[in-house]
């Protein structure tokens, strides 16, 4: 190989080397753009997920707050129910002939009015009495204490020993009830 040919080859090699870095640089920049686009998409998804999670957390906290407000009187209401029960028992214990006595009549009327006012106040705060007598036994609302022979269908509440109450949609106290059972002379039909 002559010296001229060597110079020519060296020039070609030098020229091809100078072209390769540009091509390599272009390939790297294309890969870099793709990487950045992929990272951008991932960050967008992460941002959307974070926003959705924050919104769900906000909704859950608002619901918990409203429930806390609605049910904040639960303990106090249970205590007041025992007062209402005692007033009912006191009135029930007074014989009818004494209720008619002029000296006691106004006292009895005052106790009855106080009991009604107490129940009205409880109702204003979402506390309602559970209707039991004549209803089918519902274990979510009633606590069966005894079975009583009755002509009513089996499982029907025939006696209420203690009233049950709900606060909004939750049970505050179950009603203690007596439930009908078939009379001893009757046979069960299958």
Curated annotation (Swiss-Prot):
Principal place of residence: cytoplasm
Region (Disordered) residue spans: 1-39
A molecular function (GO) term: protein-folding chaperone binding
Compositionally biased spans, kind Basic and acidic residues: 1-31
Keyword Cytoplasm: yes
Subcellular location(s) per record: Cytoplasm
Tree of life domain: Bacteria
This protein's record includes keyword rRNA processing: no
Gene Ontology biological process terms in this record: protein folding
Gene3D superfamilies named among the record's database cross-references: 3.90.20.20, Head domain of nucleotide exchange factor GrpE
Cellular component per GO, a single term: cytoplasm
Keywords: Chaperone, Cytoplasm, Stress response
Pfam (any one): GrpE
Listed HAMAP family: GrpE
Family named by the database record: Belongs to the GrpE family.
Quaternary organization: Homodimer.
Summary of the function given for this chain in its UniProt record: Participates actively in the response to hyperosmotic and heat shock by preventing the aggregation of stress-denatured proteins, in association with DnaK and GrpE. It is the nucleotide exchange factor for DnaK and may function as a thermosensor. Unfolded proteins bind initially to DnaJ; upon interaction with the DnaJ-bound protein, DnaK hydrolyzes its bound ATP, resulting in the formation of a stable complex. GrpE releases ADP from DnaK; ATP binding to DnaK triggers the release of the substrate protein, thus completing the reaction cycle.
Protein name: Protein GrpE
Organism, as annotated: Zymomonas mobilis subsp. mobilis (strain ATCC 31821 / ZM4 / CP4)
